[in-house]
Amino acid sequence: MDPSGRLNVAPAGEPVVSVVMVLFGGWDLARRAISALAENTEQPFELVLVDNASPDDTLARAEAFVEGVTIVRNEANRGFGGGSNQGAEAARARVLCFLNSDALVQPGWLPPLLERIGESGVGAAVPLFLNENGSVQEAGSVIDSIGHAHAVGSDGDARDFRYRFPREVDYGSAACLVVRRDLFLELGGFDEAFSPAYYEDSDLCFRLHARGLTTIFDPRSRVVHVRHGSGSFESARKLMEKHRAVFVERWNERLLERPRFVEVAQNPSQMLAARDADALDRFLVIDDRVPHTDRGSGDPRMSRLLEELARLWPSARITFLAADGEDAERYAPPLLERGIEVVAPPTDWVKWFEERRFHYGVVLVSRGQNAARFDGHLGLYQPQALRIFDTEALSFQRLERQVELSPGGRERNRLRAETAKMRESEIRAVQEADIVFCVSEEETRFITEVAPGKRTFVLPGIVEPVPDAPGFDERRDLLFFGGFLAGAVSPNEDSLRYLLAEVLPHFWEDHPDVVLNVIGADVSDSVRALEGPQTRIVGYVEDPVAWLTRARVHVNPMRFGAGLKQKFLDSLAAGLPFVTTTVGAEGFPLGDVRPSLVSDDPVELAALLSRLYTDRAEWERVQAHLLELASTRFDADSFRRTLVGAMAYVGVAPPAG
């Protein structure tokens, strides 16, 4: 804004979007809208103002306030559709944004909508509309069988994950609607049969749909909309009802496919059914928590599984249900941005399942404790769904191994009871599932024993080898990598204590200058106390790869645990040889390098460490084998092929292409 108080919005270069704003009085709101547009838009834009013969001094005040703008002046009111069409004709950018004069764009509003409009098959994009108090006004909209429009999330909490994932919607409100200019003009613009306002945006989106193009809601873009700020509520209601009749007559055949709403407020399942009506498949995935991608415990694998489901089946509705909401706000956004609905967790489990009765075609439950916890809910509310049990790791095996190491007495008896209960839960989950996902051939053999004929699919984690992994001479010292979430009973804390007490004293006799660096999340005071002259307790690091590519050997002699260990997958990808036990090596087809890496004897473990640390040729042989494993056995393509085959087995059509 210059010293005179005038606002210059002339684009500095070719505009990426032409913003079309129709005016009919109401200058005070329009001024706020234009000011917000100028303040919160970083990309060059063109502003096209269409004055529909405002009955007051709006046009004069606009001309006095803003410069660098294209103004279309009408002698009579052409209505919203007609005025918008004029603005589109006058615009020069490849992309149009129709913006109400009572719509206040928020910081970062434009890039997500431009991103969506550039995607194949997308015809239009709309933001999350907020009320002035910050609550949700409209998180996308659905239209029922008699043409009534229903805003998703009306007056809801904008922080709620239900309103924070992008998805296809029935239509997007022209309060802020982005569409390609050539496509808009090719369609003939807004139909002026809906003049002066209402339902022209619904009609446009239905015409896009008839061409095979979707309208996408993206909540990363946010716009505050002053509800009916450009007219009275009563006049708006009457216009809506009049134009609904026109809309229903035109689109009756498609509307017959839409659900009939009775009392939306009292029956949220109707809104849910309408929201997901066009989803070709509906998947419910249940796990302990929103995946902590910077931790182990199966979380990176679950994150990748969800990512691949969303990538391979973009037309599916994927709901991720977390049994615990721990750090959900921190870790949910990447899933939400992929179009995955995250529930972490509901405040009322029974109500949540009741509202989604018969909603899902496939339910995937990860881990035995979750299968046991949700078995009753799923049997009652989703009996029609095909069931997948994802072992992640057979927890009873970890407990069995822990029992063997326990001191005896009451604690051993407690562990034995817990082991028996977990074994029973996991066997039941295997037997009741239609198919089973597991992480290793070892787990497959157990499943075959307890459920002969059960169809299993091995889905280990995915890693991507580090390009040009550093060689022998570029590395030094030892690395211990593992999280300590379970505290004193953590497999990694037990392993570290065993390493320091039984293995490294033998190694350090010949290599006293070599340091052991310990990295991993949730380090306890008892682990911190293990620091010493040759042991550095680093703790949590944001970038483990930096450590994995500096160390010469990774060592973690696990004495109990189960499943495929993420820490060693990360070692594969970094080209870092690891030394471990038979428990630690479970699930890794190490082949002829196994004797160089695996032992359950502490003296032999020390000898393996010593040889790898000093023998360049052996180290390079092992590194080459591990990098080959990473690229051929734990690669994304192998994971996807197995996943597509598994989903086809339960009746989900393979993805197009």
Model-derived features: where do they sit?
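C-terminal, non-catalytic tails of nucleotide-sugar-dependent glycosyltransferases
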Residues: 1-14, 123-124, 133-134, 150-168, ...
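Short, acidic, metal-binding catalytic loop of nucleotide-sugar glycosyltransferases
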Residues: 35-44
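A conserved acidic beta->alpha catalytic loop
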Residues: 51-60, 76
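Glycine-rich, basic loop-to-helix element that forms the pyrophosphate-binding segment
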Residues: 74-91, 101
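A recurrent flexible, glycine/aromatic-enriched loop bordering the glycosyltransferase active site
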Residues: 81, 89, 136-138, 142-151, ...
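Short aromatic/hydrophobic "clamp" motif used to bind/position activated sugar donors
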Residues: 96
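Conserved donor NDP-sugar-binding/catalytic core segment of glycosyltransferases
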Residues: 103-143
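Conserved catalytic-core segment of nucleotide-activated headgroup transferases in glycan assembly
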Residues: 294, 298-307, 320, 431-438, ...
